[in-house]
């Protein structure tokens, strides 16, 4: 009796949740490469991006999104919320990422957005490795699931890559039988230029922590190949002179540290030597100016 192989499946899955629950860490873990920057600061992800996770059984095109939140005062917050909601258009399924042991109003908001979209929702309970009392997990899952419908529920640790195989198996069941949309070596739809800017922004968040002004973004002014060398020029935009001084640091030491670590990350990701220059410039009110946001690459 001959064995029949399972059909190949391929489809898109939106990764949704409130800020700082580990959506980007989960996306990177599933893709197997760094396509989305990560920090402890909420709202690290500001753009929709595709992470392409390819397995022998199929391919998942993951739409990593900005965290859904209630803050609507700044234009940047409104644009990011619209981007998160817009990521649900045309997807086959969605992942709602929450933090183990915690459910708040923003989690409820994210669930309502997914319910309105009418797509199958897989609940991913992340950071289970941080639970001090492991016996509290099952009562928490029962509480969250009460009155809410999920296609599957998966406790995971995205950081430690625990519980991901079972999650992938259930996600592949929710996408259609189809050929892969991308080549097996492709991991994202974003350009190297975009990723370079994100790596600088990641180091800004990691080096400055709570000192980092919220209204900070990065624009890549130059990205050029010079033989085996990549020459990259990055502008860090802030809204006030005082913020500029914070980013530069005493004697330029902080900016040098940011640039040095971002360059190493770029060389690792791009597989090439990088010459990186960084500047800090001021543009007042850019984070509440939709035209400026569009110029800096923020879109819905």
UniProtKB/Swiss-Prot annotation:
Region (G2): 43-47
Keyword Transferase carried by entry: no
Limits of the Era-type G domain: 9-177
Any one Gene Ontology BP term: ribosomal small subunit assembly
Subcellular location: Cytoplasm; Cell inner membrane
InterPro entries: G_ERA_dom, GTP-bd, GTPase_Era-like, KH_dom-like_a/b, KH_dom_type_2, KH_sf_prok-type, P-loop_NTPase, Small_GTP-bd
Positions in coiled-coil regions: none
Membrane topology: Peripheral membrane protein
PROSITE patterns recorded: G_ERA, KH_TYPE_2
GO CC annotations, alphabetized: cytosol; plasma membrane
Region (G4): 126-129
Pfam families in alphabetical order: KH_2, MMR_HSR1
Region G5: start-end pairs: 156-158
Subunit structure: Monomer.
Protein family according to the UniProt entry: Belongs to the TRAFAC class TrmE-Era-EngA-EngB-Septin-like GTPase superfamily. Era GTPase family.
Record function comment: An essential GTPase that binds both GDP and GTP, with rapid nucleotide exchange. Plays a role in 16S rRNA processing and 30S ribosomal subunit biogenesis and possibly also in cell cycle regulation and energy metabolism.
Protein name: GTPase Era
Gene name, Swiss-Prot/TrEMBL: era
């Amino acid at each position: 009796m001959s064995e029949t192989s399972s059909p190949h499946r391929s489809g898109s899955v939106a990764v949704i949740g409130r800020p700082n629950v580990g959506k980007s860490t989960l996306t990177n873990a599933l893709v197997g490469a760094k396509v989305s920057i990560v920090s402890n600061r909420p709202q690290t992800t500001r753009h929709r991006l595709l992470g392409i996770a390819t397995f022998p059984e199929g391919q998942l095109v993951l739409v990593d999104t900005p965290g859904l939140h209630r803050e609507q005062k700044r234009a940047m917050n409104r644009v990011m919320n619209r981007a998160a909601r817009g990521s649900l258009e045309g997807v086959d399924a969605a992942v709602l990422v929450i933090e183990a042991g915690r459910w708040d109003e923003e989690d409820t908001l994210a669930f309502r957005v997914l319910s309105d979209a009418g797509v199958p929702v897989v609940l991913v309970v992340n950071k289970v490795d941080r639970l001090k009392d492991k016996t509290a997990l099952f009562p928490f899952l029962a509480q969250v699931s009460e009155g809410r419908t999920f296609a599957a529920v998966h406790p995971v640790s995205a950081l430690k890559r625990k519980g991901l195989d079972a999650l992938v198996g259930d996600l592949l069941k929710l996408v259609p039988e189809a050929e892969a949309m991308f080549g097996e070596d492709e991991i994202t739809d974003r350009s190297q230029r975009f990723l370079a800017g994100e790596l600088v922004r990641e180091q800004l968040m990691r080096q400055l922590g709570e000192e980092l002004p919220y209204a900070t973004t990065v624009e890549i002014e130059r990205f050029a190949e010079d033989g085996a060398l990549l020459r990259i020029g990055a502008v860090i935009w802030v809204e006030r002179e005082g913020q500029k001084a914070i980013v530069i640091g005493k004697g330029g030491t902080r900016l040098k540290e940011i640039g040095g670590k971002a360059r190493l990350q770029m060389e690792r990701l791009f597989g090439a030597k990088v010459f990186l220059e960084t500047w800090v410039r001021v543009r007042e009110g850019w984070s509440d100016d939709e035209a400026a946001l569009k110029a800096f690459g923020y879109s819905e």
